A protein has these predicted regions:
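Short polar/charged helix/loop
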Residues: 1-117
Length: 117
């Protein structure tokens, strides 16, 4: 089973919405979400980064954070969705913007090798 990690800043709006949407779009799949800030609802950590086959981040700043904090070896599994931080959880516009980007990411997720086998 593929493991996907969704990352935004506070793990409050964008990444939880994306995680729920992608779980609906492509079950069965292990999907969780986290934030880059220490105050995030679920702060990103080494274990989450190591376990994920693919890491979908909302902004390039999140990709840089992951590479700087957890190492270059994780850069190849990061997909930047380019979703700015101006939405609230399950906002209709956020869902509308996320869906096509997640569909595109699903193609990358399916093509990504599964290291846990």
């Amino acid at each position: 089973m593929k493991k996907v990690l969704m990352v935004c800043t506070g793990n409050k709006d964008r990444s939880p919405t994306a995680a729920m949407l992608i779980a609906e779009m492509c079950a069965p799949m292990w999907v969780t979400s986290a934030g880059t800030e220490p105050w995030a609802k679920n702060p990103v950590n080494q274990e989450l980064i190591e376990e994920a086959d693919v890491i979908c981040v909302m902004e390039d700043a999140h990709r840089r954070f992951i590479v700087e904090r957890f190492g270059d070896s994780h850069a190849e599994k990061v997909v930047v969705l380019d979703i700015p931080d101006n939405y609230v959880c399950w906002e209709a516009t956020l869902v509308q913007v996320l869906k096509p980007k997640l569909r595109a990411a699903l193609g990358l997720i399916s093509a990504h090798p599964h290291p846990h086998r």
